[in-house]
UniProtKB/Swiss-Prot annotation:
Pfam families listed in its UniProt record: LysM
LysM domain sequence ranges: 72-116
CDD domains per record: LysM
Annotated TM spans: none
Ranges for region Disordered: 1-40, 194-215
UniProt name for this protein: LysM and putative peptidoglycan-binding domain-containing protein 2
Xref: InterPro entries: LYSM1-4, LysM_dom, LysM_dom_sf
Residues recorded as bearing N-acetylalanine in the entry: A2
Keywords, sorted A to Z: Acetylation, Phosphoprotein
Coiled-coil features, chain-numbered ranges: none
Amino acid sequence: MADSSPAPSLRAGGPREPRPSAPSPPPPHSRLGSEAEEAELSLSLARTKTRSYGSTASVRAPLGAGVIERHVEHRVRAGDTLQGIALKYGVSMEQIKRANKLFTNDCIFLKKTLNIPVISEKPLLFNGLNSVDSPENETVDSFSHEEELVAAGEDVSPLSPQELDVQPMQPEEVSARDFLQRLDLQIKLSTQAAKKLKGESRDEEGLYTASLYHS
């Protein structure tokens, strides 16, 4: 009879090493997340607009603490230039263009007044609804008033040094003179009252002494 024993499953030379498995593909949800991030990044880059020459897009840098931007009204006159106005108020021509929506430098003559964005370091004080005028606003208003007088042909005569020295001293001199006069009057009244009281006391002592003598 033939041998019916099963053939050995292992060959001579020992067991066979397992083959390395191929890397598994990434799960679908991770690929979807990365694609969504890339799409969002591309949209954010597309929203960022580059500024071209003559653009009136209002792109403002964040102001620091205690720095504010206010607008000063400037009347356009014959002979004004955008560069001269910018140098006068200490701002750039692009800031004036953005504030007034101007496309070229010659467009300033299309407007009667221009809004000049002036940056100040002192914050404005508010009393509910209306703002309190700061000393800087008063300086700008007085300067514009003098310009209007000069443009109208009126001479603005500056004050002489003697007038500047005399004017603020007048209220102080009057108040000091009044104070000294009042002080002298009080001293006189006090002296008279003291003399009167002293005389009355002497009369009373004399009457008392006379009454004792007669008694």
